[in-house]
Amino acid sequence: MNYRLKKISGDASFREFYRLKKNNKTSIIVSAKKEKYKNLIVYSVVNKILNSNKITAPKLISNHYKNNMMEISDLGEHSFLNLIIIKKNKANDYKSLIKIIFKLQQIKLKKNYKMGKFKIKFPKYTLENLHKESDLFFDWYLKYFLK
């Protein structure tokens, strides 16, 4: 078998992402520092919630939480930002995005989620959380994508 691993850009977290190419198929390896491995479990639960609500998110292929990593499906190399930069007619893309935001708002979270032996409980989303995440947009996303 022919394997190739290439680091790819990540998100505003401490996770690292790598594209794994096995023959002609790709997947994503996500790793975290040892003390942050539980974040991988939360990441998996969030993706599972999104998928169960018909919102496209990576699917868990295999977990190696004890080794601070997991393998997820590869959704491709294009971000929403990349797509709207190259398109002339962006209206349909923005309409799709608004539909996704509406779907996100309709999700009713359970009190607890289970992933293997782990129980995950999401804290209540507060105005303070909103401000922190809004700051991420300016501090991380804009700096990263508008270089």
Predicted regions: what they are:
Residues 132-146:
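Active-site activation/catalytic loop segments of kinase-like enzymes and analogous catalytic loops
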Residues 18-132:
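ATP-binding pocket architecture of kinase catalytic cores
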